[in-house]
UniProtKB/Swiss-Prot annotation:
InterPro entries the UniProt entry points to: AP5B1, AP5B1_barrel, AP5B1_C, AP5B1_middle, AP5B1_N
Descriptive protein name: AP-5 complex subunit beta-1
GO biological process, one term: endosomal transport
GO cellular component terms attached to this protein's record: AP-type membrane coat adaptor complex
Subunit details: Probably part of the adaptor protein complex 5 (AP-5), a tetramer composed of AP5B1, AP5M1, AP5S1 and AP5Z1. Interacts with ZFYVE26 and SPG11.
Keywords attached to this entry: Protein transport, Transport
Task of the protein: As part of AP-5, a probable fifth adaptor protein complex, it may be involved in endosomal transport.
Presence of keyword Transport: yes
Biological source species: Rattus norvegicus (Rat)
């Protein structure tokens, strides 16, 4: 069968794109991939049609060649077609390279046993190196244009098989000084360098001279399939979370290169950074992130290599580059950014965020950067939201929210205002227009706009979003909470149709606001019975706020409202309020009301419900009424009512998700042994738990996987069950453990529940050095102190002292790690940080408000953690 015509291919491609799965399932779909590869070599089809065919293969490679065998054959055919192209310039060469790479990757055929892979890799590296590959690949000028495409293909292969191109590092580095496209080569080199550092650190290997070019010929370049195959989980690096998020996904490589590799590594990174200004902003951001992420945990490599770029990047107007700067700041902190740099960066963010011509997305980006600004020395516990310390009155004045702002911008600025109010708890009495005054004025304006009868629903939604944000951020501000409750009560009085919004707000707010708001809304409802539509909203609100309230006023309201309940919807709303009262025990007045409703309601369904509620009230005690009418404790009902009879059987076969039946807490830690151990305590809450299995997951890849723990049984009332959880950090950094419990109930059902995450603090990783012979302590410490340099780093930190003094502080927090003690003047402290680091402290003579601390470590990445730890000792 000959090649299809242009019209036939156009019709076939159109049918395929309309529904790929349906087309491939039909008769024509069986030979689509074969026909496509065959017709690419036909001289009867124009180049434009072939471009369409190759574009289709790029978009739907996984459907055309779904398995490794088909993908291998397709890639081989595409490479053969590439070789057979005439020497004249052609747009097909670039697409053929991309199509062959895509087929191998999407089909899972990329590997050391793949013949197509062994042909493609040398070809791509040769094109990327600018070598003359022969007339089959076009003229020399056209081959230069293929360099960028070859770099893109190599980058895709490296992402799929990290460490594959480690042996080509020297060749790729040599390309930076040659003529050719700078951006593709720079990004490829940065990616390969990043993956090589991480992959080599996984197996404890060094760079082994990989950065030095030995032989640039494509045939002799060693493809490191060993590392690529052993690293079975593809790298999926994420941008560093900022400290306020508390959910960083960091994976610090631990690598200690020899001096020669260190020099070459510094030179390669400096070379990449020096030429980064020639790249597009997005490419620059990617390059900076890759290098920063790779070097973050590399021993002996402080981030000063990035310092020359800060002068240029701090003044950038590109959002992507600004985000990279903030990511570097979050990663390296005061090790890279001075206090002047921090003040300049925050001032710039603040001033730009006030520009009136900013588009809304850009405006929100700058506000988010301010809200999540990674500070060098943050106050308060890690993960707690707070406004930047350097955001003084002059800077914050232009960031106040206004009713004229876009809703999302208003909420972002309101979030910042709430954080400022939280910091200004001790406002001066003479301050007339402080943050709290401004906040109350803004809330009053939002409530007035939402109270307009018939006004836009968006204004009401914005008002409740702002109210929720305020109560979430200012739970400990009674003045603001009281003002907010009063304003919301006035809003309901003016516009009862907003009852659904109030119900949602009551479900979401904290108990500090829920109870006073419930009482105020209850008073507003019973004071204004209303008719028709207003009555419908009052009954909906009353069903939410009636529980726990005195019933006399509510029953009077219901008796007056029953006269106006004329349709089925109002009947149901009235009965929902009665049900809410029944859950709290009911009473004689409620029994009379239910009897009256059972006689008077026009709807038969309503009369039956009223009669049922009366029977329950007459025959059940208050506690049993609450259980019968409260939320069901059983498993959720099945979707089909036909399966109701088998409900219990189905529940017994399924693992049900429930609320946590146990409490897991962190006990006092003991620093001893070769590995840090997290001491936990498990306690049952209300019911016994059997065959308990606790599964732990560490955020990111900071630690080795934590094994599950099995406990035969835990009963309430018994002492807490001790649990020792060994940790194997890959780098000395704090982390969070997500915990899931799988257990059996006394009824024999298997359930699972998510427990609150556990925090592993930096101090929980501290381990002491082995016990030393008496008299050798000082010499041992001096040897450790001298061994830290020049590979390590030295710094000085001011440690505030509380009222307890230096001796008490050392005794409480650092006693197991003291090597030499000369109280009350000097303490020499040595700490082991798993897996292979150490921290040395010299606490000198204490002064009035603190003590100067000289420290050395062989891992500069722990400097910000050490600074935060020492500054926070006085608070504990």
């Amino acid at each position: 069968m000959g090649p299809l015509s242009r019209e036939a291919w156009a019709q076939r491609l159109g049918s395929f794109r309309a529904s790929p799965s349906a087309f491939l399932a039909g008769a024509e779909g069986e030979d689509l991939g074969h026909d496509l590869l065959s017709d690419l070599r036909s001289e009867k089809l124009s180049e434009l049609i072939k471009v369409s065919l190759l574009t289709l293969s790029l978009e739907y490679s996984d459907k055309l060649w779904p398995d490794a065998l088909a993908a291998e054959a397709a890639a081989t055919s595409l490479l053969d077609t590439l070789v057979l192209l005439p020497s004249k310039p052609s747009a097909l060469r670039r697409l053929l390279l991309l199509a062959a790479t895509t087929a191998l990757v999407s089909g899972g055929a990329l590997g050391p046993t793949s013949e197509a892979s062994s042909r493609l890799l040398p070809l791509l590296l040769g094109l990327a190196s600018g070598q003359d590959m022969g007339r089959s690949f076009g003229t020399t000028s056209e081959q230069r244009h293929l360099q960028a495409t070859a770099c893109e293909c190599l980058g895709e292969l490296e992402r799929c098989k990290p460490g594959l191109l480690a042996g080509a590092l020297g060749v790729l580095r040599s390309l930076l000084g040659q003529k050719g496209p700078i951006q593709p080569v720079s990004l490829l080199l940065a990616l390969v360098l990043h993956n090589t550092l991480v992959v080599q650190s996984r197996f404890g290997a060094g760079l082994q001279g990989l950065l030095v070019a030995k032989d640039s010929s494509p045939g002799s370049c060693p493809w490191d399939w060993t590392l690529a195959e052993e690293w079975d989980d593809h790298l999926k690096p994420q941008a560093h979370g900022w400290p306020t998020a508390g959910e960083e996904e960091r994976d610090f490589p631990i690598l200690d290169p020899n001096p020669e590799d260190t020099r070459e590594l510094k030179a390669a990174v400096a070379q990449l950074l020096d030429t980064s200004y020639l790249l597009t902003p997005v490419a620059q951001a990617q390059l900076v992130w890759l290098l920063g992420w790779a070097l973050q945990g590399l021993r002996g490599q402080p981030p000063v290599l990035f310092k020359p770029q800060l002068v240029r990047l701090l003044g950038t107007a590109q959002l992507t580059l600004l985000h990279s700067v903030l990511s570097l700041k979050a990663a390296f902190g005061e090790a890279l950014f001075t206090a002047q740099d921090e003040a300049l960066l925050l001032r710039r963010l603040t001033l730009v965020a006030q520009h009136p011509a900013l588009p809304s997305p850009t405006h929100l980006f700058y506000l988010h950067c301010i809200l999540s600004f990674p500070e060098n020395c943050p106050l308060g516990p890690e993960g707690e939201e707070a406004a930047p310390l350097l955001l003084g009155p002059q800077l914050r004045r232009g960031l106040m929210p206004s009713l004229l702002h876009d809703p999302m911008v208003l909420l972002a600025r309101l979030h910042l205002l709430c954080l400022l109010c939280a910091d200004d708890e001790e406002e001066e009495k003479g301050q007339l227009q402080g943050p709290q005054w401004f906040l109350q004025e803004l809330l009053a304006g939002l409530q007035q706009r939402a109270a307009v009868d018939g006004g836009p629903r968006a204004l009401a939604t914005l008002c409740f979003q702002a109210s929720y944000l305020v109560t979430s951020c200012l739970t400990r501000q009674p003045t603001v909470q009281t003002s907010l409750v009063h304003g919301l009560a006035q809003l309901y009085r003016a516009r009862p149709s907003l009852a659904p919004h109030f119900v949602d707000l009551l479900d979401e707010v904290s108990p500090e606001l829920r109870e006073p708001l419930r009482k105020v809304l209850l008073r507003e409802v019973v004071a204004r019975p209303g008719k028709n539509e207003a009555l419908r909203w009052h009954l909906q609100m009353l069903a939410k706020v009636a529980e726990g309230a005195t019933q006399s006023a509510i029953l009077g309201f219901l008796q007056a409202a029953a006269i106006h309940c004329t349709d089925w919807g109002l009947h149901q709303a009235l009965l929902r309020v009665c049900r809410a009262l029944l859950r709290t025990g009911g009473g004689e007045g409620l029994a009379d009301l239910l009897q009256e409703l059972a006689r008077q309601l026009e709807n038969a369904d309503g009369r039956d419900h009223a009669r049922l509620y009366y029977v329950l009230l007459s025959h059940l005690s208050s506690s049993k009424l609450g259980m019968a009418l409260g939320p069901s404790l059983a498993a959720p009902a099945l979707a089909s009512s036909l399966m109701a009879e088998n409900q219990g059987f189905a529940s017994a076969l399924m693992v049900q998700e429930t609320s946590a039946p146990i409490q897991l807490s962190v006990g006092p830690q003991k620093a001893k042994g070769p590995l840090p151990v997290l001491h936990l305590q498990v306690q049952a809450l209300d019911t016994p738990v059997y065959s308990l299995e606790l599964r732990f997951r560490v955020e990111g890849q900071l630690y080795e996987p934590v094994e599950a723990v099995h406990i035969p049984s835990v009963r309430p009332g018994q002492p807490a069950h001790p649990l020792h959880l060994p940790l194997q950090p890959r780098s000395p950094a704090p982390a969070r453990l997500h915990v899931r419990a799988l257990y059996t109930t006394p009824a024999g059902l298997t359930c699972h529940a998510h427990l609150p995450p556990l925090s592993v603090n930096f101090a929980d990783l501290f381990l002491p050095f082995p016990q030393l012979p008496k008299g050798s302590e000082l010499c041992f410490f001096d040897e450790l102190w001298n061994s830290c340099l020049p590979k390590g780093v030295e710094s000085r930190v001011w440690c505030p002292l509380g009222p307890q003094g230096l001796e008490a502080l050392v005794s409480q927090h650092l006693e197991p790690f003291v090597v030499v003690a000369q109280p009350p003047t000097t303490y020499l402290i040595a700490v082991r940080l798993p897996p292979h680091s150490m921290l040395l402290l010299r606490l000198e003579k204490a002064q009035v408000h603190g003590v100067p601390v000289a420290l050395r470590t062989d891992d500069w990445a722990v400097l910000p953690l050490v600074g935060d730890y020492l500054r926070g000792l006085a608070a504990h």
